[in-house]
C-alpha cells in the first residue's frame, strides 16, 4: 500500500482545497506549505498543483462537479498517475473520486501513514505502521462488495 509501486516513481497531482466552512484564513498558507513538503518527502514526481476554494464540501466527492471536470482535463493533459488531496476523505468520497477520475486517489491520512511506513526501521515500528494502515484500510472496505448483496436464494440453489 505504498505510494511508490513496483519501483516506479509516479507522476502526482496535488489538490489543495480551501474549504471556507472548515478553515481559518491565517492557517491556510502554512497548511499549503506543510502539505507540499509532506508530498515532496515521498518518492513522487509532482507534475501539477491545483489550489481550489470551496464553501461547502460535496458529500459525494468532496469536490464540486465543475471543479472535478477541470481536474479531469488537467490530469489527462499531464499524464498523472496519483492524486493526493489535503483533506481526510470518507471511503465513499475516495471511491467516487477514483471511479470518476480513473486514477488512484489518496488523502492526507494515507499519505502520512505511507511516509511512516517508508521510514520505519525497527521491526516493531514497521508492524505498528502496518497495523495503522490496515485499520485505515478496513474503513475503506465497507460497501466494496455491494455487487454481492442481492444473491439468488431458494430451494435447490
Show which residues each predicted segment covers.
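N-terminal accessory targeting/assembly segments
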Residues: 1-114
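Extended, highly charged alpha-helical segments
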Residues: 111-157
